[in-house]
Amino acid sequence: MKTSLLIAGSLALVPMTYAQDKPNIIIILADDLGFSDLGCFGGEIHTPVLDKLAKNGVRMTQMYNSARSCPSRANLLTGLYPHQTGLGHMDGSHPAWPKGYSGFRSNSDNVTIAEVLKDAGYFTAMSGKWHLGNKSNPILRGFQEYYGLLGGF
């Protein structure tokens, strides 16, 4: 009986051993957040939980926010410049922009970090606003779970 429990207990730990081979990855994108708004970057605002995540994880200190909102999301999810992703500006409703000027259609040929991580055996999930165009959605772009708004409202 003790031997059976020992073997069963040991086998139960095998998945945990493999799970530790891959680190957890959490990417946080916050609109309108300045680099010095967080305590871990010298900000005055007390952010202990985010500071702890930064201390025990990787802080990206060389990221350039190329544009607001949608283009930055596309940039972060694909590693491409916003115009390469098809999201070079916010939307096509501005009257001064030439007709047919692309910029608010996420290019489905671009590989997302979620697709790469999913193929590597990670479970991928996203929460929040997608805001990457009307024809795309997170489930079709590599996220296995999604809870949030597709638009930017």
What are these regions (language model features)?
Residues 2-4, 18-153:
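Formylglycine-dependent sulfatase
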